UniProtKB/Swiss-Prot annotation:
The keyword Magnesium applies. Its cofactor is Mg(2+). This is HPr kinase/phosphorylase. Mg(2+) binds at residues 163, 205. GO terms for biological process: regulation of carbohydrate metabolic process. It comes from Lactobacillus johnsonii (strain CNCM I-12250 / La1 / NCC 533). Residues 204-213 are annotated as: Important for the catalytic mechanism of both phosphorylation and dephosphorylation. The lineage of its organism: Bacteria, Bacillati, Bacillota, Bacilli, Lactobacillales. GO terms for molecular function: ATP binding; magnesium ion binding; phosphorelay sensor kinase activity; protein serine/threonine kinase activity; protein serine/threonine/tyrosine kinase activity. Its EC number is 2.7.11.-, 2.7.4.-. ATP binds at residues 156-163. It is an enzyme of class 2 (transferase). It catalyses: [HPr protein]-L-serine + ATP = [HPr protein]-O-phospho-L-serine + ADP + H(+); [HPr protein]-O-phospho-L-serine + phosphate + H(+) = [HPr protein]-L-serine + diphosphate. Homohexamer.
Length: 319
């Protein structure tokens, strides 16, 4: 988990933001929460519950109200709003920035930013960016590919063939997100997202060949930066004593950050085309999400057949 984000990262990743004052302080100021403050009551002088550690975002309402205050009161208010813990001030809609704010920010070495975006939209964009940056994170040993627009995480013991299978999937037109190590973070209560570490981005390790650059070999369409993990495929070496699911009735899940992700176990055996099997597993999962379950259809047909045979047997016995 990233404990804090530098204001410089915010400015770099959101081109709509421009620095008005305090460029030299961008690397010094840290943001440790995705919550954003709209200082309305503070402009009236009420600071009892002032969230000083949040980004202070001022829109048309706040700027127009501050313009009605006399100079001394406006100066006192902005001096109180500017604290050592305050990461930055942001003014939306390209509105004029009060000189009292600039002076107060300079005293506490706080960057002042501006944007032409509407306040609500800007707040949403910043919150989404910070949610992703500050989200809980962990690494999973596996390969992440996107099959027909659906993120599939392939896991299994070392040497079982995860990378080779992913390479086959890439050749079949699917996309690689990460090989060997997948960095995973929780986007919201029901969504986990996977991406590659920067040092491994677009790279794969194939035993006997070494490191290959997938984007260089197969083109930009063969890779993607990140994707939601919707299905997990667990590759296991074939065990003749194991009882593998042959009908698909027993649905299993794997918990990642308290999010239950469906998991399918695929036994690995010489002669099995794993890429096609995983491709079909992804399509079958998508069909289930759309309301069609082949295993349930089979069970329904079997029940109807048994029922018809029972009725036929009853009729024959009466004769």
């Amino acid at each position: 988990m990233v404990e804090a984000v530098k204001v410089s990262e915010l400015v770099k990743d959101l081109p709509s933001l421009r620095v008005v004052e305090g460029k030299e302080y961008l690397d010094q100021k840290l943001i440790n929460t995705s919550d954003i403050s709209r200082p309305g009551l503070e402009l009236t002088g009420y600071f009892d519950f002032y969230p000083k550690n949040r980004i202070q975002l001022l829109g048309r309402t706040e700027i127009s109200y501050s313009a009605r205050l006399d100079h001394d009161l406006r100066e006192r208010v902005f001096n109180k709003m500017a604290t050592p813990e305050t990461p930055c001030f942001i003014v939306s809609r390209g509105l004029p920035i009060p000189s009292e704010m600039l002076e107060a920010a300079e005293k506490e070495k706080i960057p002042v930013l501006s944007s032409n975006m509407a306040t609500t939209h800007l707040s949403s964009v910043i919150t989404q960016f910070l949610d992703e940056k500050l989200a809980p994170r962990k690494s999973i040993h596996g390969v992440l590919v996107e099959i027909y627009g659906m993120g599939v995480l392939i896991i299994g013991n070392s040497g079982v063939g995860k990378s080779e299978t992913a390479l086959d999937l890439v050749k079949r037109g699917h996309r690689l997100i990460a090989d060997d190590r997948v960095d995973v973070y929780q986007k919201d209560d029901k969504t986990v997202v996977g991406e590659a570490p920067k040092i491994l981005k677009h790279l794969m390790e194939i035993r006997g060949i070494g490191i290959i650059d997938v984007m260089n070999l197969f083109g930009a369409g063969a890779v993607k930066d990140s994707t939601e993990i919707q299905l997990i495929i667990c590759l296991q070496n074939w065990d003749p004593k194991a009882n593998y699911d042959r009908l698909g009735f027993n649905e299993k899940t794997r918990e990642i950050f308290e999010v239950d992700v469906p998991q399918v176990t695929v036994p690995v055996k010489v002669g099995r085309n794993l890429a096609i099997i995983i491709e079909v597993a992804a399509m079958n999962f998508r069909a289930k999400k759309m309301g069609y379950d082949a295993s349930q259809k089979f069970e329904q047909n079997l029940t109807e057949l048994i029922s018809d045979n029972s009725k036929k047997d009853e009729g024959d016995s009466r004769k």
